[in-house]
């Protein structure tokens, strides 16, 4: 059955109808053609005519004309609109007319490079031109690499290979860099956050090397490189700031082409919200089970379908569900495959070919297939969960109907706040994308890493800038103090014996890693940033790798090794940590009405103090364990909002919370005395000494009752009363803290909402942001929420949050008001029984009262 005939059945199905929150029909659109640009080599139109392309689409002609006129050009049109031809035409024109000219193509994934290789080779074959084209990445056989270095005129690679495998060895590529005429950068919306900040610095290094070989910088005069010979051709999905983003990446003006001339087929987009299985707790049926139910119907009816999952594990799980569902339906001739990172290259190529040829009917993929690899004409795309940005969602939806035919895209929401906001606010999705791609190439941690690489590649001249970074000389002095470079005359030379590119991953801000090793044999099974390791790799933790559970037996923090052993267990572990923020510098701050808001440089101090064992599926707490790890400090940028005293007093007067006295356990007197002695018998907030005849109070940083101590049943008081969780306060400061502490359920609910809604506006992943709730923050003296960039040094997210605060607060109130749960749930203020957030059963009411007071 065709999709055209299947959709009316879907519309009439009462079970599906009850789940649908939006059904949008996007009408078909005819093509808009243009004439071939006059300046284009006439051999190209003839070759394309032989392949059935008589005229270019309007955006292809416009982009070609701009590029041939010498403009760096950016094409921003939808998926499958022919962006490839828009950059291939000028590149082939230049290479046809200059036998020494070369072109570099950068793609974010290996699969995209392989896909474009075939497209270029087919066109060059029709042209009968001598233009060798090759892919050069980690999968390229070593036996072929010398031939590619010496002979390729078009090189297809990825930023990681350019960074570590090409630029440091530029002397072997001298002919290529001498003739470099064009740099193509596809899918630039992917280059955001930490990854994009790294890539911008890799491009700075590329410009230095091209300038060196092309003589763009006077070697004796030390003039700044002009790099006039290379034209940049860029392509992007729709984002809010394409020109700004492109110009930050290449540090040069770009000309924008955004009016799409390609035809589009009719597309139906369905938003589906799984039914509630527990209305009070706000729990919904798994979106994987929903995808299995409706996806199996599509496949059984002959609709070739791609399913997108958020992780490798959920992709494998959904693949199993679909195969089982088809078997229950008695459908045995439908082939469904998986596609994700970790599959061998030849296996991925075979799956792509099977999809193109129709031998494979369905594929379950991670975002590895989100980008423009040619997988043929799919009828439907099913998104199991929001991929993080509207741009990515449209990319995934665009995998169906790529050749202008009728298609379906179905978004099936998960139970989290981000998914629920999208599925309940379809206008937000279908309206203009609010997302900005943000990078910070001058993040000092990232920049210094690439400055080392650049110095290794070529000496710096006195007065030479590294891109638009204005303090290159000062940064080189810092490296000299570390013994990594030295100044001789007017040059700075690399003197270290290290290979700096090998120590820098483009996917993380910090080069410092923890290696994960099997206890038997010492085989490395993975690695992790040092910043994120403590809550996941502490001793006693259950670490999951490729769906397999490992017990962490030993963490050697100094050496950077975690030793693990495979185990079969029915529980997971969750770390218990204490964190606090120190504001190092305030860049902007406003105190108006109910809120003080600000942003600046912060230090986030964190220490993992314990963990709990949580049974899978039921989430029952099975027990606790202690951890002794050093404090970690993340220096980054943060945004904060703090409640005014009158807001706190009004909520306190409303009696929206209660506070029962605690039994602090048998070791409380001893631990209390130790804490007072450690703090010098002074209040840690105001510095006041203990008055005669009266002792100061001792406060639990993480509230005592969240540790689940039950006298006679467990000894969880030991974790709660560890000195790391205690601080000495005078009576006045303690009252202020406790006043804020009783608000903490509302504050935590609001922080959870802001943390989940912010990525929609920032075009980042929730994991790019961290957050803290402080009942009485030292830098504001008030109950405070802090959201911070998790990349060392920050990448610009906090500053944008400061500007977005009004919209975010309104969106948060709307979200919690509309949620149908009783007390709070993952779709609004977070799970009501989770760890430090479980300070009040009715966190939802507290959060809503707090938002109403703020926005009154």
Model-identified regions with their sequence ranges:
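Extended, highly charged accessory segments
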Residues: 231-234, 413, 455, 462-532, ...
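Histidine-centered nuclease catalytic patch
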Residues: 687-728, 739
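Short Cys/His-rich Zn2+-coordinating modules
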Residues: 660-671, 706-716, 806-812
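Helicase motor core with emphasis on the C-terminal RecA-like subdomain
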Residues: 4, 8-51, 55-62, 68-163, ...
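Short metal-coordination and nucleic-acid-contact micro-motifs, chiefly zinc-binding Cys/His arrays
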Residues: 676-680, 722-726, 821
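Cys/His-coordinated zinc-binding microdomains
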Residues: 687, 734, 829-832
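The −1 position to Zn-ligating cysteines in a subset of zinc-ribbon hairpins
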Residues: 542, 682, 697, 729, ...
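Short helix-coil boundary/hinge micro-motifs
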Residues: 670-682, 689
């Amino acid at each position: 059955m065709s999709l055209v005939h299947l959709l009316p059945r879907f519309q009439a199905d009462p079970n599906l109808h009850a789940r649908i929150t939006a059904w949008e029909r996007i009408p078909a659109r005819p093509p808009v053609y243009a004439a071939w640009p006059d300046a284009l080599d006439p051999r190209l139109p003839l070759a394309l005519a032989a392949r059935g392309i008589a005229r270019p689409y309007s955006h292809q002609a416009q982009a070609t004309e701009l590029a041939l006129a010498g403009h760096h050009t950016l094409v921003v049109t939808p998926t499958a609109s022919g962006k490839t031809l828009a950059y291939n035409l000028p590149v082939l024109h230049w290479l046809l007319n200059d036998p020494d000219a070369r072109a570099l193509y950068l793609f974010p994934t290996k699969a995209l490079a392989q896909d474009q290789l075939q497209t270029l080779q087919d066109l060059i074959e029709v042209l009968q031109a001598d233009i060798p084209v090759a892919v050069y990445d980690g999968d390229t056989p070593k036996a072929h690499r010398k031939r590619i270095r010496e002979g390729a005129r078009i090189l297809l690679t990825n930023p990681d290979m350019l960074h570590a495998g090409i630029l440091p060895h530029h002397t072997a590529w001298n002919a290529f860099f001498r003739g470099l005429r064009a740099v193509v950068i596809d899918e630039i919306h992917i280059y955001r956050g930490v990854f994009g900040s790294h890539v911008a610095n890799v491009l700075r290094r590329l410009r230095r090397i091209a300038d060196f070989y092309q003589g763009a910088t006077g070697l004796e005069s030390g003039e700044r490189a002009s790099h006039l010979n290379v034209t940049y051709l860029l392509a992007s999905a729709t984002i809010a700031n394409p020109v700004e983003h492109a110009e930050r990446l290449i540090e040069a003006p770009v000309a924008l082409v955004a009016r799409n001339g390609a035809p589009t087929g009719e597309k139906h987009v369905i938003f589906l919200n799984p039914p509630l299985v527990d209305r009070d707790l706000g729990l919904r049926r798994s979106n994987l089970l929903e995808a299995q139910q409706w996806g199996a119907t599509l496949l059984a009816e002959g609709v070739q379908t791609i399913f997108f999952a958020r992780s490798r594990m959920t992709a494998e799980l959904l693949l199993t569900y679909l195969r089982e569902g088809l078997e229950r339906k008695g459908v045995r001739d439908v082939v469904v495959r998986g596609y994700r990172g970790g599959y061998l290259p030849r296996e991925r190529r075979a799956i792509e070919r099977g999809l193109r040829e129709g031998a494979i009917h369905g594929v379950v993929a991670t975002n590895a297939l989100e980008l423009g690899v040619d997988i043929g004409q799919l009828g439907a795309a099913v998104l199991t969960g929001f991929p993080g940005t509207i741009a990515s969602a449209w990319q995934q939806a665009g995998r169906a109907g790529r050749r202008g035919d009728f298609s379906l895209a179905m978004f099936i929401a998960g139970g989290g706040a981000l998914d629920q906001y999208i599925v309940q606010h379809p206008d937000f999705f279908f309206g203009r994308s609010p997302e900005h791609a943000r990078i910070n190439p001058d993040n000092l941690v990232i920049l210094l890493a690439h400055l080392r690489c650049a110095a290794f590649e070529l000496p710096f001249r006195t007065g030479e800038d590294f891109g638009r970074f204005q303090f290159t000389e000062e940064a080189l002095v810092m490296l000299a103090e570390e013994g990594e470079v030295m100044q001789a005359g007017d040059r700075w030379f690399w003197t270290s014996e290290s290979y700096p590119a090998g120590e820098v991953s483009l996917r993380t801000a910090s080069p410092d890693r923890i290696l994960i090793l099997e206890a038997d044999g010492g085989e490395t099974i993975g690695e992790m940033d040092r910043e994120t390791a403590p809550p996941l790799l502490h001793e006693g933790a259950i670490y999951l790798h490729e769906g397999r559970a490992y017990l962490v037996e030993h963490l050697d923090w100094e050496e950077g090794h975690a030793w693990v052993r495979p185990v079969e267990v029915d529980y997971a572990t969750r770390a218990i940590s204490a964190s606090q923020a120190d504001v190092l510098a305030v860049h902007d701050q406003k105190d108006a009405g109910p809120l003080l808001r600000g942003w600046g440089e912060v230090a986030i101090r964190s220490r993992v103090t314990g963990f709990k064992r949580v049974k899978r599926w039921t989430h029952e707490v099975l027990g606790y364990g202690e951890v002794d790890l050093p404090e970690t400090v993340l220096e980054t940028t943060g945004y904060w909002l703090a409640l005014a005293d009158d807001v706190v007093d009004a909520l306190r007067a409303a009696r929206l919370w209660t506070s029962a006295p605690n039994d602090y356990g048998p070791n409380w007197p001893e631990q209390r005395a130790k804490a007072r002695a450690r703090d010098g018998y002074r209040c840690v907030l105001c510095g006041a000494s203990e008055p005669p005849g009266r002792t100061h109070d001792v406060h639990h940083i993480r509230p005592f009752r969240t540790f689940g101590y039950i006298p006679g049943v467990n000894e969880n008081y030991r974790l709660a009363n560890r000195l790391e969780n205690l601080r000495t306060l005078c009576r006045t400061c303690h009252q202020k803290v406790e006043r804020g502490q009783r608000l903490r359920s509302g504050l935590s609910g609001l922080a959870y909402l802001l943390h989940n809604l912010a990525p929609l506006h920032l075009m980042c992943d929730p994991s790019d942001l961290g957050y803290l709730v402080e009942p009485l923050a030292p830098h504001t003296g008030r109950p405070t929420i802090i959201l911070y960039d998790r990349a060392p040094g920050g990448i610009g997210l906090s500053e944008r949050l400061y500007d977005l605060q009004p919209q975010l607060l309104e969106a948060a109130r709307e979200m919690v008001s509309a949620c149908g749960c009783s007390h709070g749930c993952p779709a609004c203020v977070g799970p009501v029984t989770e760890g430090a957030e479980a300070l009040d059963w009715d966190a939802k009411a507290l959060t809503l009262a707090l938002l109403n007071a703020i926005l009154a």
